[in-house]
């Protein structure tokens, strides 16, 4: 429409006759989509009309004004005006105008419902939302209605939608609600309310028609969320009677949450029946995690792809005379081989490894526990020669090295982390109480850390008193380990007595080490407590001592871990920007990584400005936080944000950038992540440079281990498959970040590692190698990185070979004869060789990598790769839960025959066969004698002789 026509309609608004004004409004409404800019200049005239109570078509004026504000992208004003237009604003209209305003209305309603609701909301908003609920139910768009109901915290509507939905769709809706509840709700109390509703629907379905396998998992984890251990125990017991593999799978899911206090109660509540004793024992072993440790150990040894040349390359490039580099290299090797049991590098370089002294020796020896972490029963055997004298299994000869003794005790704790093994706990407790041993700080320090790890989350009051006595001695080194051990034992329990004692002692002592440890311990005690920890958080964050505020921000991080809670995020951002202490600001940023790891894609938006902060401590924290939240994801935005920090002017920022990048690039290869090769070269350049800062060298060496951890088969994973934050993993990672103050804490990263594999096991708890599955991607996309190629000529001094003149003349005559023969043969062969080359070239072009491949059990499967996993139909072994395509999966054997091969069994049979072969037969297989080496004349050597 022409501009003059619009002006004519606008002029009608200024007429005295109301009928002419109405005509003007009607005409303008019809052309507002294309002429809103001109109409916007006359909003005052339109406002006068809808404010005039005597005007008969006020609603039409509201509607026109709403359309103008909509095109101006002032959606809230447009919504308020549209709601006043009454019948003109039709919610059912399928237009962009209606859709955007309805979404704005719903968002405002949700925000109001999620707030404290102290302010009143326009009742018309609720009217629109109610109309949308009715529309969703009328159109059978139940998921949309359920989504609005969940976000607006309308439990009545959730119940109504589920009750009124068709029975065939109800199961799907309940499962959808469960996923939303676990992954999206950041309010603990509301999540509990929804879980109670879910349980009632699952129970109803169980009674009427039975549950699907994955619904049993959802029901058991709903019991876990509400702490209903008796119901969970009864569910497992019922399944043992009718579906043993499913009962074992449910137990595995409960165990993976690492909620140790709940698991302990479930075990105690299991019915005791003699007819069921063997299966009950198996379930207890699964719930306790013992079975999974053994399975993971076998798998990590079987799949181990650790490149021996990789660590040798670092070893040859690093100046090991510097204690920091020497210790970092030993820790790097332990991270590389975590859980694999492969300590060959240490054995091959035992003299070099033993050069470490004092606390470096303590940390290095403890790192052996990382390598052998899957075999806790062998702990004393592995550390036998380093245990304190006078103890069972301890060293009986030679001068004692207290740092070795303490490191061995720490290593035993690492191997027993979370096992709560009574014998190990008693052994470490006896050392702490032994007056001959507890006078030595390294021994007591190692024993306390070991005890805390072995009794992780046990809430054992006896151990608390033992450690409290050590803490009361007010010795900086031993007090630090005792305070941290109290936090480990009370982790996730919110124990009031422990909180009171830690707060009291933290504010009374003068030792910074102890103050920091008490703050960190309080963070561990508050793990996963959310709103229940607000009192502790408030008292820590308002303290004048910045070290306690440091503990306060970490407490926020662990209390709200994996929730993406807006209140927690705002609080951490406030302290990251406004606190006067660098330590507090750095820790606040790191804590954001723990709070937001469940929605890591949102991290770059929040971290964008922090990454460019003038404060190097904030930049360091940003790199570490991104690494924690995005570990193993290869998330490009996070990598791009950290990349400038790799060349930062501050040494410790570069260290943090390397560690953060290594965490993100775990298990990547050149095909999935083009930046990997460049990053590895950066690490190599940093640790090889003679005059590089030692902090950067340490970061580069540790990062080299992290990026290929656990034989290239382990990754930092802070949550279970179902999205529950894992206590041990989160605790291990938060203590690892404190290596800033105490480098032996690097060993705690082992608690955060988990295998990246799909492991199928049958109800005998063995791994059938006959089971296989299909992965619908090219193998090279997620395959192991290429191993380092050994250059045989590298690092070897070349010598010029001396030959006699007669030998040269003989070779020349032979060469003439050969040339004559070759000239004739070349003509004959030329034609055929060209044809062969052509055929080979054609074959290469035809040989394209297939888009899928078959993976045998157990197989390496990355978290981001699991969506491509497909189980083969009509296969002998079928998974109990087909939705589970990662981690431990129990299988149904459809043939139930004895003709099966298992991981480890076939290997033993092969070893037995090899033992039966006579030694002479082995010797006869290699009759060729190697030729002598070329004669090399070294003039310098002759002169020396």
Question: Which residue ranges define each predicted feature?
Answer:
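Extended alpha-helical assembly domains of large eukaryotic scaffold proteins
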Residues: 1-799
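Eukaryotic intrinsically disordered, low-complexity regulatory tails and linkers enriched
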Residues: 629, 722, 735-945
């Amino acid at each position: 429409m022409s501009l003059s026509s619009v002006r004519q309609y606008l002029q009608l608004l200024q007429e005295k006759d109301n009928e002419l004004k109405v005509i003007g409004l009607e005409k303008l409404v019809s052309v507002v989509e294309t002429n809103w800019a001109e109409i916007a200049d006359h909003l005052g005239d339109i406002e006068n009309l809808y404010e005039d109570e005597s005007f008969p078509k006020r609603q039409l004026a509201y509607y026109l004004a709403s359309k103008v504000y909509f095109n101006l992208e002032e959606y809230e004003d447009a919504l308020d005006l549209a709601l006043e237009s009454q019948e003109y604003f039709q919610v059912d209209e399928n237009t962009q105008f209606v859709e955007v305003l309805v979404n704005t209305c719903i968002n405002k309603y949700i925000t109001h419902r999620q707030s404290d609701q102290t302010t009143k909301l326009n009742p018309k908003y609720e009217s629109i939302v109610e109309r949308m609920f009715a529309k969703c139910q009328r159109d059978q768009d139940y998921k949309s209605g359920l989504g609005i109901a969940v976000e607006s915290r309308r439990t009545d509507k959730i119940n109504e939608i589920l009750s009124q939905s068709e029975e065939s769709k109800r199961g799907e809706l309940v499962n959808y609600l469960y996923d939303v509840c676990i992954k999206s709700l950041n309010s603990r109390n509301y999540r509990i309310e929804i879980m109670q509703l879910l349980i009632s629907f699952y129970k109803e379905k169980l009674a009427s028609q039975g549950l699907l396998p994955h619904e049993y998992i959802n029901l058991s984890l709903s019991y876990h969320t509400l702490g209903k251990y008796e119901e969970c125990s009864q569910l497992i017991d019922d399944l043992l009677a009718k579906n043993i593999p499913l009962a074992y799978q449910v137990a595995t899911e409960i165990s993976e949450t690492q909620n140790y206090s709940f698991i302990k109660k479930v075990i105690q509540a299991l019915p005791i029946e003699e007819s069921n004793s063997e299966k009950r024992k198996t379930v207890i072993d699964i719930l306790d995690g013992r079975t999974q440790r053994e399975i993971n150990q076998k798998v990590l040894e079987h799949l181990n792809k650790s490149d021996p040349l990789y660590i040798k390359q670092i070893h040859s490039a690093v100046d090991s005379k510097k204690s920091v580099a020497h210790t970092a290299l030993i820790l790097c090797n332990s991270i590389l081989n975590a859980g694999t049991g492969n300590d060959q590098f240490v054995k091959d370089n035992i003299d070099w490894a033993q050069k470490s002294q004092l606390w470096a020796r303590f940390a290095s020896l403890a790192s052996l526990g990382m390598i052998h972490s899957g075999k806790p029963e062998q702990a004393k055997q592995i550390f036998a020669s380093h245990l304190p004298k006078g103890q069972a299994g301890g060293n009986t000869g030679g001068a004692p090295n207290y740092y070795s003794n303490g490191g061995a005790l720490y290593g035993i704790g690492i191997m027993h982390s979370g096992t709560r093994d009574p014998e190990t706990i008693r052994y470490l407790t006896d050392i702490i109480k032994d007056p001959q041993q507890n006078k030595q700080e390294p021994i007591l320090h190692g024993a306390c850390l070991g005890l805390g790890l072995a009794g992780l989350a046990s809430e054992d009051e006896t151990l608390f008193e033992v450690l409290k006595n050590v803490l009361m001695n007010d010795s900086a080194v031993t007090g630090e380990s005792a305070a941290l051990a109290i936090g480990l034992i009370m982790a996730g329990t919110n124990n009031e007595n422990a909180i009171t004692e830690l707060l009291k002692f933290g504010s009374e002592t003068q030792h910074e080490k102890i103050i920091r440890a008490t703050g960190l311990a309080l963070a561990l005690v508050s793990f996963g407590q959310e709103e229940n920890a607000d009192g502790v958080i408030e008292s820590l964050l308002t303290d004048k001592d910045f070290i306690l505020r440091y503990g306060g921000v970490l407490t926020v991080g662990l209390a709200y871990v994996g929730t993406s809670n807006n209140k927690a995020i705002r609080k951490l951002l406030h302290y990251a920007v406004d606190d006067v202490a660098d330590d507090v600001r750095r820790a606040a940023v790191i804590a954001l990584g723990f709070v937001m790891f469940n929605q890591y894609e949102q991290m770059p938006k929040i971290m964008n400005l922090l990454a460019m902060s003038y404060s190097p401590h904030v930049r360091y924290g940003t790199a570490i936080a991104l690494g924690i939240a995005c570990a193993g994801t290869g998330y490009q935005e996070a990598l791009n944000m950290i990349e400038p920090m790799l060349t930062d002017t501050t040494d410790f920022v570069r260290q943090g950038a390397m560690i953060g990048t290594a965490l993100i690039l775990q298990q990547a290869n050149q095909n999935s992540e083009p930046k990997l090769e460049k990053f590895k070269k950066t690490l190599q350049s940093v640790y090889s440079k003679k005059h590089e800062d030692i902090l950067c060298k340490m970061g580069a060496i540790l990062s080299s281990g992290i990026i290929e951890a656990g034989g290239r088969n382990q990754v930092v994973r802070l949550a279970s498959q179902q999205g529950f934050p894992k206590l041990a993993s989160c605790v291990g990672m938060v203590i690892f970040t404190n290596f800033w103050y105490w480098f032996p804490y690097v060993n705690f990263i082992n608690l955060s590692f988990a295998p990246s594999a799909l492991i199928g096991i049958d109800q005998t708890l063995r791994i059938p190698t006959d089971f296989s599955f299909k992965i619908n991607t090219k193998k090279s996309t997620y395959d192991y990185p290429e191993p380092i190629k050994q250059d045989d000529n590298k690092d070897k001094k070349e010598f010029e070979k001396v030959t006699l003149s007669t030998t040269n003349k003989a070779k020349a005559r032979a060469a003439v004869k050969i040339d004559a023969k070759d000239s004739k043969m070349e003509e004959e062969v030329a034609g055929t060789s060209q044809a062969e080359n052509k055929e080979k070239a054609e074959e290469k072009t035809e040989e394209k990598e297939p888009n899928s491949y078959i993976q045998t059990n157990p197989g390496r499967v990355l978290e981001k790769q699991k969506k491509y996993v497909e189980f083969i139909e009509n296969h002998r072994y079928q998974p109990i839960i087909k939705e589970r395509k990662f981690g431990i999966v129990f299988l149904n054997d459809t043939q139930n025959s004895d003709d099966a091969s298992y991981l480890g069994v076939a290997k033993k049979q092969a070893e037995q066969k090899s033992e039966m072969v006579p030694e002479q037969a082995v010797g006869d297989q290699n009759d060729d004698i190697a030729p002598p080496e070329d004669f090399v004349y070294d003039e310098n050597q002759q002169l020396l002789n």
